[in-house]
Amino acid sequence: MKTLYSLRRFYHVETLFNGTLSISGRDQESTGFAWWSGNARLINLSGKLLGAHVAHAGLIVFWAGAMNLFEVAHFTPEKPMYEQGLILLPHLATLGWGVGPGGEVIDTFPYFVSGVLHLISSAVLGFGGVYHSLIGPETLEESFPFFGYVWKDKNKMTTILGIHLIVLGVGAYLLVWKACYFGGVYDTWAPGGGDVRIITDPTLSPAVIFGYLLKSPFGGEGWICSVDNMEDVIGGHIWIGNLLIFGGIWHILTKPWAWARRAFVWSGEAYLSYSLGAIATMGWIACCFSWFNNTAYPSEFYGPTGPEASQAQAFTFLVRDQRLGANIASSQGPTGLGKYLMRSPSGEIIFGGETMRFWDCRAPWIEPLRGPNGLDLNKLKNDIQPWQERRSAEYMTHAPLGSLNSVGGVATEINAVNFVSPRSWLATSHFTLAFFFFVGHLWHAGRARAAAAGFEKGIERETEPVLFMKPLD
């Protein structure tokens, strides 16, 4: 059959233009994709695509293990984690491994074990990736029909979706089991400055858990990022674990309804676009969580939030000047407002000065000093504990801010040399990567929709100037 265009000049979305061609190779002629298109060459080769995905998982796990051991090798117990540029050890510490009261690291061996386990796992995954890429069957449908698939098989696709959902649900329950039965997790709100504890009474009330979803994402509401206790965190994982597992079973046992069959595009590239969109959404949520939340991301390990550092500075100077004889209740600042304390718009007693903008900040080192109407003057005069002073002094000099001038009253120039908060790293990296994933979602969604609608795929190159130029030799 005569083809209208050269296959070398046409890049395909899902199917080859010439249906008579073999799909067994990995070159441009047989797949319609050049080498730099990567896994697109394997769209119809389920065995080889499995190898690519397993190898990719191996690379991810290898990075986790190697970076884990790198951080362990460079870790200095005398310094806080957030001062050492660590991003993996804080996650392990949050899970309750190797830490004691106040977030003090008392044993680094669990971190070493974690790194080694990840490296061993990456070797297994790497072997599987190489095997399925080079040795195993090119397609799974004939030899292993359970693992085989056709992209347009709607029932098979939802079955695969269901299996993935169940695996995610089990993952959510791993945190629940760790928190409730296997040693507990680190709770920054534990009395006395945080500690590892067993979560014995996780929140199961749907009104509380789903109430977070109904909150506004703006202002003081904070949507799900406003969670401020470990009972709600673990209870939320119980709910999401149940929903994922039961949703997975549902998708395995049922076939897509008619409206779903009509609404979605059922092709490999469409599934890729859906996945990229979901990852982008989760990346943006993770960005906000790591920046604003100090419960799931304890400040003992990740450093203070911006508002927390600002409030810590106001608190530190209040403690200092009160010892020097200042009347913290009535002293005025240069603007006539309270220098140390003032009233919020709703009448609560709050810290004065420029940190007033963060008056609704909540942090475990300051909450014990509050009363029914904001900060309690009697507690500020008589009940401040040494650990609160030490922590606020540490936090005020480790704001997660990239500015050389004052932001929110924080004297950031003292942070300008050799300090970038893990919150800054995590928030900016997740925001940026989520944006790129979202662009990928739009790109692949557009291509998948065009293919489904029968539009011309690829770029018309018949009139491309370079095709009419003399060869270089």
From Swiss-Prot:
Sites where the protein binds [CaMn4O5] cluster: E367
Residue numbers covered by the propeptide annotation in the UniProt entry: 1-14
Keyword Manganese found: yes
Membrane topology: Multi-pass membrane protein
InterPro entries from the UniProt entry: PS_antenna-like (IPR000932), PS_II_antenna-like_sf (IPR036001), PSII_PsbC (IPR005869), PSII_PsbC_sf (IPR044900)
Transmembrane segments: 69-93, 134-155, 178-200, 255-275, 291-312, 447-471
Modified positions (Phosphothreonine) in chain numbering: T15
Keywords associated with the record: Acetylation, Chlorophyll, Chloroplast, Chromophore, Manganese, Membrane, Metal-binding, Phosphoprotein, Photosynthesis, Photosystem II, Plastid, Thylakoid, Transmembrane, Transmembrane helix
Pfam families: PSII
Modification N-acetylthreonine occurs at: T15
Places the protein is found: Plastid, Chloroplast thylakoid membrane
Domain of life from the UniProt record: Eukaryota
GO BP annotations listed: photosynthetic electron transport in photosystem II
GO cellular component: chloroplast thylakoid membrane; photosystem II
GO MF annotations in UniProt: chlorophyll binding; electron transporter, transferring electrons within the cyclic electron transport pathway of photosynthesis activity; metal ion binding
Cofactor: binding comment: Binds multiple chlorophylls and provides some of the ligands for the Ca-4Mn-5O cluster of the oxygen-evolving complex. It may also provide a ligand for a Cl- that is required for oxygen evolution. PSII binds additional chlorophylls, carotenoids and specific lipids.
The protein's assembly and partners: PSII is composed of 1 copy each of membrane proteins PsbA, PsbB, PsbC, PsbD, PsbE, PsbF, PsbH, PsbI, PsbJ, PsbK, PsbL, PsbM, PsbT, PsbX, PsbY, PsbZ, Psb30/Ycf12, at least 3 peripheral proteins of the oxygen-evolving complex and a large number of cofactors. It forms dimeric complexes.
Annotated function: One of the components of the core complex of photosystem II (PSII). It binds chlorophyll and helps catalyze the primary light-induced photochemical processes of PSII. PSII is a light-driven water:plastoquinone oxidoreductase, using light energy to abstract electrons from H(2)O, generating O(2) and a proton gradient subsequently used for ATP formation.
Recorded family membership: Belongs to the PsbB/PsbC family. PsbC subfamily.
Name of the protein in its database record: Photosystem II CP43 reaction center protein
Organism field: Mesostigma viride (Green alga)
Organism lineage string: Eukaryota, Viridiplantae, Streptophyta, Mesostigmatophyceae, Mesostigmatales
